[in-house]
Regions:
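Beta-propeller blade termini and top-face loops
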Residues: 1-200
Length: 200
């Protein structure tokens, strides 16, 4: 990821500072004490008390993550799926049987896909989960059976291009959509819109 940099000569030169997680999103400098910095990055929050020479991480102390998206199945109780910045994809059960104001806390489990994945769940069988990962990786998984690390059996259903079509290109969060008329039909967005009639 991108490093955090500082200039001490008005922007003529820059130097990377800190040994911390990359991809920085926010930096706050205390207006009353410029030695005190708070940095928000893909790994969480880090704090410096000496203008960035040393940083204190809170990765194991703050239970926070950044979800890219959320999808859910049609079961009762239902499962919600999401991809998390730098932490892969997760799923959890949402039980509304006691009311919306009494949803019990649930531990998240591993889910198909990675940090930049979108999910589509078969409405006929909530154990069939499609994940479109970053840069065009598509898989179909059966989440009813997982290995010791919590990973579901999956098969790649990434579209294949002909020789004249070049390389398959996709976005960071490549879209995958299941037809509302026929759950066997999938649409995937790359440099072309792909359609599968048979679940990939």
């Amino acid at each position: 990821g991108l490093a955090l940099n500082v200039s001490r000569d008005g922007g003529r030169t820059f130097q990377a500072i800190g040994d911390m997680h990359g991809d920085h999103h926010a930096l706050w400098i205390d207006p009353d004490n410029p030695n005190f910095l708070v940095n928000g990055n893909d790994g969480g929050v880090v704090v410096s008390y000496d203008q960035g020479r040393n940083w204190r991480e809170f990765l194991d102390n703050l239970p926070v993550v950044q979800f890219f998206n959320a999808s859910f199945d049609m079961d009762t109780p239902f499962r919600v799926y999401g991809s998390i910045q730098d932490h892969g994809s997760r799923r959890a059960v949402v039980d509304l049987s006691r009311g919306r104001d009494r949803i019990p806390a649930q531990a998240f489990q591993n889910a198909p896909g990675g940090e930049g994945s979108r999910h589509a769940i078969d409405p006929r069988n909530p154990n069939v989960v499609y994940s479109a990962g970053f840069y065009h990786n598509i898989n179909r998984a059966d989440v009813s059976s997982v290995d010791a690390r919590g990973r579901a059996q999956s098969v790649s259903i990434t579209p294949r291009l002909g020789p004249a079509d070049g390389y398959l290109r996709g976005q960071w969060l490549s879209p995958i959509v299941m037809s509302v008329h026929n759950p066997d039909v999938l649409y995937f967005g790359g440099q072309y819109v792909f359609r599968s009639w048979n679940r990939g």
